[in-house]
């Protein structure tokens, strides 16, 4: 068994990943912005504080490219340098589906830095999380019974964060997929009317999809206290959703985990309490 660092351990993917790795017998060190504890180190990617301490004795690592920022390549360079110096056996980096489309984009520049580092790696690029519907898009659902997004009839192959964690748990501990990148999707592509119907069925309430403008989405994100730069970034990438870039389906989850991805209807049943407020 290995000593594995999880950067982003308190997040939507990080939490189930930690549980899975511990269940497999690995020693997990959680890196978060919180105060250190018995199995937790404090790490600030913006200042670089705690990077050297976090990697002490580490053999393998999962690294979440930090959300809420637009300079992930700059923030992650010291992480890759420390991992290289420590001789890590594997580093799994999570960015986002489509991150490799533009070589000048911060996500892609971070990926390239890892690819060229000499560290055995995997890059995973998940599509839009199913869990966005019980977080980012939750307010409109519980207050108005509506999914409010500027996406029209476009479809997305939404992925459950638990599947992302399952993939990461396999990749970080194995070498047979070394130095490969994977786009991660669910097993079906749904439009937001279909999503609304699934949520309605799971909750026995009426939930509808309402197409809105980009400006309305931005206003809602800012009202939810998201940083302006990140809110604007979300509006931009949702524009790609509307253009159909989130519809493709891959077999990566099944290839790596040996099972089919979680269906949206199952996600809706598992999280139904989130929308019953």
What are these regions (language model features)?
Residues 2-30, 38, 46-49, 56-59, ...:
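Oxidoreductase cofactor-interface core, primarily capturing Rossmann-like NAD(P)-dependent enzymes
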Residues 16, 215-277:
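A hydrophobic C-terminal alpha-helical subdomain
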């Amino acid at each position: 068994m290995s000593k594995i660092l999880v950067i982003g351990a308190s997040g939507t993917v990080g939490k189930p990943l930690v549980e899975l790795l511990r269940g497999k017998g690995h020693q997990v060190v959680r890196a978060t912005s919180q105060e250190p504890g018995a199995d937790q180190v404090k790490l600030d990617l913006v200042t670089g504080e705690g990077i050297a301490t976090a990697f002490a004795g580490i053999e393998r690592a999962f690294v979440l490219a930090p959300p809420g920022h637009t300079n992930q390549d700059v923030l992650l360079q010291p992480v890759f340098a420390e991992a290289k110096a420590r001789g890590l056996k594997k580093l799994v980096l999570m960015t986002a589906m489509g991150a490799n489309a533009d070589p000048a984009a911060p996500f892609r520049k971070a990926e390239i830095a890892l690819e060229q580092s000499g560290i055995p790696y995997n890059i995973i690029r998940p599509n839009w999380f199913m869990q966005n519907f019980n977080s980012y898009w939750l307010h409109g659902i519980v207050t108005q019974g509506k999914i409010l997004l500027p996406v029209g009839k476009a479809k997305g192959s939404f992925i459950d964060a638990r599947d992302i964690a399952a993939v990461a748990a396999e990749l970080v501990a194995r070498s047979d997929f070394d130095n490969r990148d994977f786009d991660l999707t669910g097993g079906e592509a749904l439009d937001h009317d279909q999503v609304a119907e699934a949520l309605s069925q799971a909750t026995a309430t009426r939930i509808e999809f309402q197409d809105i403008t980009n400006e309305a989405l931005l206003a809602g994100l800012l009202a939810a206290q998201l940083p302006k730069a990140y809110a604007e970034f979300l509006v931009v990438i949702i524009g790609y959703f509307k253009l159909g870039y989130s519809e493709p389906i891959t077999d990566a989850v099944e290839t790596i985990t040996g099972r089919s991805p979680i269906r949206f209807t199952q996600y809706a049943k598992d999280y139904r309490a989130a929308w019953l407020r």
